[in-house]
């Protein structure tokens, strides 16, 4: 569920992944403080152990997409909003490609790019996802029915489970789903699958 980080490379220059994980850690802590809840409270809400919550906030471990999904559920926020909450500067209308936050799941190799300009107050989020061959990620129910998403496949084949249903999607296919239904994504092919996720709230 998480990858333990080595402390032997402290002197090495911070990578883009390090920056993203710091944003996530800061975002979790800030959101938790905004809600006025303790690490124990978040652990109870999300089903993630109190020890793991603390390690993630201290950047001692690299959380997987599934684990982050559970934490975001406990915080009542999407991952994109979580990352944005760690940014103190006001939002800009343009998100340059080189400046868009990119996060890699240490468990699956999934690469998630937050395309939408952050901190603009928009109720729409646009995320680009690259799912490696022979990998999958599953998300628990997010108890907020007003969140939904449209998934548009750009390249490759994507298998999406949504509740009790399974959908095989190809390039150009689009599917709508809600966050209050368990869902997951799998790439059974031999090459990466790329897709866009449009989240509305």
Language-model segment annotations:
Residues 97, 101-141, 201:
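A short glycine-rich, His/Asp/Glu-containing loop-to-beta-strand
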Residues 1-19, 162, 172-173, 193-196:
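N-terminal flexible/basic segments that precede or flank functional cores
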Residues 115, 163-178:
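Short acidic-glycine-tyrosine-enriched beta hairpin
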Residues 128-132, 143-160:
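Short, conserved beta-strand element in jelly-roll/cupin
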Residues 47-61:
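Recognition helix of helix-turn-helix/homeodomain-like DNA-binding domains
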Residues 110-111, 122, 170-171, 179-201:
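Ligand-binding loop in jelly-roll beta-barrel domains
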């Amino acid at each position: 569920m998480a990858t333990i980080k080595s402390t032997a490379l402290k002197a090495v220059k911070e990578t883009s992944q390090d920056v993203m994980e710091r944003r996530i850690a800061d975002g979790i802590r800030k959101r938790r403080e905004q809600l006025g809840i303790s690490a124990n409270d978040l652990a109870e809400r999300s089903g993630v152990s109190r020890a793991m919550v603390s390690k993630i906030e201290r950047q001692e471990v690299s959380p997987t997409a599934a684990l982050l999904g559970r934490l975001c559920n406990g915080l009542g926020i999407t991952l994109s909003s979580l990352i944005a909450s760690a940014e103190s500067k006001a939002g800009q209308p343009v998100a340059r490609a080189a400046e868009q936050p990119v996060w890699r799941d240490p468990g699956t190799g999934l690469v998630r790019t937050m395309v939408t300009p952050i901190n603009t107050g928009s109720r729409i989020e646009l995320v680009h996802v690259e799912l490696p061959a022979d990998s999958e990620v599953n998300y628990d129910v997010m108890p907020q029915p007003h969140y939904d998403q449209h998934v548009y496949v750009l390249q490759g084949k994507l298998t999406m489970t949504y509740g009790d249903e399974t959908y095989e999607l190809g390039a150009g296919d689009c599917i709508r789903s809600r966050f209050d239904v368990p869902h997951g994504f799998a790439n059974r092919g031999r090459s990466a699958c790329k897709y866009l996720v449009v989240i509305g709230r």
